[in-house]
Design a protein with these regions (language model features):
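Intrinsically disordered, low-complexity coil segments
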Residues: 23-25, 46-54, 155-164
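Non-catalytic surface loops within mature trypsin-like serine protease
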Residues: 3, 66, 87, 346-348
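C-terminal, structured domain-capping segment
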Residues: 40-94
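Short loop/turn segments at connectors of secondary-structure elements within structured domains
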Residues: 8-11, 54, 75, 162
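Short edge-strand/loop segments of extracellular domains
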Residues: 2-3, 84-88, 183-185
Length: 366
């Protein structure tokens, strides 16, 4: 970024100014936006002189640096941006719209409605959202480092312990759904059965794990989890909208389980990706670019590890669906050892206390 005289602007506090050397030995200086998305503030509260007339001029150049390294992961990706000059304040994080003792779920929906999805990474899945779930939920979607949805639960320590750090999936019927950041490791079921209500993992989650949460359990809603799953065709090789319909929507099985703790759905994982991925299928044997393998860099729910979901394959008595370490959706025997992340819904009565939602400043509740 340079001013009208060609002088480099180096005092923007929201970005890191760097000097690097490209593959040909050329030195390039500027602000690093490699992992940036959403709204980036360049100048804030800048006074504009109206009289006498004055023209402020800046030149903004975006450079893709060609290093001597494998950059094949960038193939097929696109870049776009807009320059905004605004008078009104645009809210970016929860603390911009929420104060102590507001309902957490209301804070999230208010932020979404007062801002734009490209800024907050919160998408309202109403009938107007292309390829959305159409369940009126509000879901966080996009690259992990661009989403401010961290929440600290069950701890008042200034630095949230790993065991207490969660991320918000979204708001569903006034309840806030969260998923633990740090995964565990176990079988879906020790006896290799894919009936969730009697599975060893469900027993652990709603027994030992739930007890370990202490008083936080009072803030967790008892939920009717839809656990009938679906077929290979309508879960593993379908687009998110179809997956949602067969997992929890109008075409879902009547098989349910009432409990406080569960796991993510396949559709939770898939709708965690940026909207550009919502036309992909979970798995494509002939073309990985058409499957969720291609969405890894734009899906905050992707861990880089193989992990279980709560959904089973309905045409089998022992296989359940999971996410592979390559980002695609697959299924396997319930006795298989994989990672899993506990997930649950917070009651609507839960109040926001503080926090912007970043990993270092997670949301705190009452």
């Amino acid at each position: 970024i340079t001013d009208a005289s060609g002088n480099a602007v180096t005092d923007i506090t929201s970005l890191t100014y760097k000097t690097v050397t490209d593959g040909k030995g050329a030195s390039i200086s500027g602000y690093d936006i490699t992992n940036k998305s959403g709204l980036i503030t360049l100048f804030d509260k800048k006074a504009i002189t109206a009289s006498p007339t004055k023209t402020d001029e800046w030149n903004i150049t975006v450079t893709f640096i060609n290093y001597n390294a494998d950059q094949s992961n960038n193939a097929g990706n696109t870049f776009s941006g807009k320059i905004l000059i605004q008078k009104e304040f645009i809210p970016i994080v929860l603390s911009d719209v929420c104060t102590n003792e507001n309902n957490l779920a209301t804070c999230i929906t208010t932020l979404a409605n007062k801002s734009e999805p490209s800024i907050t990474n919160i998408y309202h899945h109403d009938a107007n959202l292309e390829n959305g779930a159409e369940d009126n939920s509000y879901r966080y979607a996009g690259a992990s480092n661009s989403i401010n949805n961290y929440i600290c639960l069950g701890s008042n320590e200034s630095t949230c312990p790993d065991a207490n750090l969660f991320r918000i999936i979204g708001v569903f019927e006034d309840q806030t759904k969260v998923i633990q950041v740090t995964p565990f490791y176990d079988r879906w079921d020790a006896d290799d059965s894919n009936t969730w209500s009697t599975s060893s993992l469900n027993t652990y989650l709603n027994g030992t794990y739930l007890t370990s949460l202490g008083t936080l359990t009072d803030k967790i809603a008892t939920t009717t989890w839809k656990v009938g799953g679906g077929t290979y065709a309508n879960i593993q090789t379908s687009v998110p909208k179809t997956v949602y319909q067969y997992e929890v929507g109008s075409s879902a099985s009547s098989t349910t389980n009432d409990a406080k703790i569960g796991l993510m759905y396949v559709s939770d994982y898939e709708y965690g990706a940026s909207p550009s991925a919502w036309t992909l299928v979970g798995y494509n044997s002939s073309d990985a670019t058409k499957s969720y393998r291609a969405s890894r860099s734009i899906n905050w729910m992707y861990l880089g590890l193989s992990e279980w979901t709560i959904s089973r394959i309905s045409t089998s008595s022992y296989n359940s669906f999971g996410v592979l370490n390559d980002g695609s959706v697959d299924n396997g025997p319930a006795r298989t050892l994989l990672r899993f992340r506990p997930s649950f819904y917070l009651e609507f009565s839960v109040k926001y206390v503080s926090g912007s939602g970043t990993q270092s400043d997670p949301i705190r509740i009452n």
